[in-house]
Amino acid sequence: MNQTQNTTVNTQLEKTLPSFSIVYETENLSSVELDNIYRSLASISQQEISPEQANEFLIIDAGNAPPEVIEELCSKYPWLTVEKATNIGYYEAKMLGAKLVTGEIVVFCDSDCEYTPNWLKDILSTFLKGPEVKVVAGETSTAIRNIYELAIASNYFFPRFSRKEEPYPTTSYFLNAVAFRREFLLENPIPTNLPLYRGNCQLHCYYLCKLKGHQIWKHPLARAKHEPPTSSFIFWRSLLAGRDRIYRQYIKSIWQANPDLKDFSQVNINQEVNKNHSIKDILATTFRSPFKLRMILSVIREKPSRIFLLPLALPFILWFEILRSTGTMITYLKPNWLMETYKQKEEQESQSQEVISASPAK
């Protein structure tokens, strides 16, 4: 198909698509380099379905990007709208955006991801299957350019891209590459008042699919490339992942008993974690296999020569798992210590950055 024919097809498709809005955040820039937001928005600007067709392209700016960067981006991409929202987390930013926009479909993407040109088209066109399609995700994976990134790809939570070509039902999504029918999302919101660092999406998927019987669709050609986290960020990310896996277990058990519960602010999960546990339960939760064989095999299958580099990546993989296990053990002893310590660190770094920004240039 030549370029003229392709343009005609896309124009015809645009006429049949539901109205949509795009919600974007800056909170994830805390885990990667600032340059990522430029590459991310550049990839979105080159979509086959232009972001200018959206009712809104709304950036929820929590202050993770300098004001001059946001101003520069708004000048370059006039279809951007910015909503300032200080002291707001990742999931709160997403749900705030969903409430503010007006499209029938709300599309979520992140500042640390780059998207293939067909990404938005494939996500939106999947909704044309019928009104029963409520959630459509794309596939997200990480780049592999060195040994560290090979370790991330073999142990982090983003799998490699599948070899599928058609949309398929699934029970999971990543919030950096997913779209919802807006009314459905507002009726079944992503929980934001959970005592977790990350993992709200996992629990949202559990709620939607296991408890409520809904289905998530995934389009394998709608691909997002996620920038691997920096080595400084992965330290705390791994510790807190060990903490979060305990909390997720308790939240699931609470949800099983009360599937309609949406406000966890009154639930004292710390008290549940503090209860006496058998040594067997603690060891089973803490010490898990550090090697995710399925992920490792998919990394090698994608490029067989990586098998020779894998031994060099193993120390990183073991380090990540040691951190997770350490986070789990600390949480059994002092349930909220890790989260409180991390928040204090973040607050101190934020205050230091404000002081630097306020200092007159020499």
Residue positions per predicted region:
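N-proximal low-complexity "stem/linker" segments adjacent to membrane-targeting elements
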Residues: 1-43
